[in-house]
Amino acid sequence: MREVLVVSESVELAEEYYLSFNKFSSGSTSLLGQVTKASFFSSLASSGTKSLNTKSFGLKSLSLKSLNTKSSGLKSLNTKSSGLKSLGLKNEFDYLTFEQVKSSGLEDERYELILVVCDDTDDFYGEKGLANLTLFHNSLLPNGKFVLAVPLNSPHEEEMRKELMYSGLVDVASCAYYLTKFITGVRPNWKAKGDRKSSSIHAAPIDGYISKAPDYESCSTKPRACANCTCGRAERENLNSTDSNANSTDFNANSTDFNGVDLTTNSKDVSGVDLVVDVDAPTSSCGNCYLGDAFRCDSCPYKGLPAFKPGEKVLLE
């Protein structure tokens, strides 16, 4: 069963409009789809419905404020004596006044068709109009149709068409007949800002592109640098050894050096200290041992001895 809502000020007027649209929808083309002026009203003229007089299908029969039940033929649409079933009307519709819609609201995604008969267009443009149209939009099912019937001389037709689009309706169109304007729109079958499926393509973990770095090894706790030292200790030891050799002075035991001092025999300097060449003296790792305690390491074997020239060892008497 098709869900239809008709909003107007009287149930008689709602019945007449619903009967008109239902009679048209029984043809090959429905107003609920593409609305055209010629097809819609030619269908009404040839429908054979005595209760619908196309010559008087103007503002007096469609307008809310100027509705005259005696001249519009609405008595023939009384639910008790109209014989709607004999006219082929099989679908029921919900009826509400506009005040009831604004006070109680509408259920979301319920109706396939919402027909609003309105004589006061102030409720359908501007900020108030957008709120009202959004209410009707949300109550439509996907691909549901919205039809707004307003007076032909309404000065805000263009504004109302825009408000229908702003509310989310698409395929907005309008057609006129005598003193009535029909503005229609369709709710799309998609939702703005709807949930989008995430991509099914997943990137490979970055660990698959980057090789793992080897574990860091340190030989700081070992007596000497490792053969494959990676902590820098081997480089430091090689550098210190090079500096020590550069600062050392080669000497010949058979020659004299250090201002004529004979290095092959014991001799005394002016302070009475014996100067003896020690060819087996420990090798300095820093190269600063001969400069004195101020330049020596804490573990220096020459700690406490006076400064001396490179290649000599001081022996106290």
Curated annotation (Swiss-Prot):
Region feature Fe-S binding site B, mapped onto this chain: 286-300
Sequence motif: Cx2C motif 1, positions: 286-289
One Pfam entry name: CIAPIN1
Region of interest (Linker), residue spans: 193-216
Binding, [2Fe-2S] cluster: 219, 226, 229, 231
Molecular function (Gene Ontology), one example: electron transfer activity
Quaternary organization: Monomer.
Known function: Component of the cytosolic iron-sulfur (Fe-S) protein assembly (CIA) machinery. Required for the maturation of extramitochondrial Fe-S proteins. Part of an electron transfer chain functioning in an early step of cytosolic Fe-S biogenesis, facilitating the de novo assembly of a [4Fe-4S] cluster on the cytosolic Fe-S scaffold complex. Electrons are transferred from NADPH via a FAD- and FMN-containing diflavin oxidoreductase.
Protein's UniProt name: Anamorsin homolog
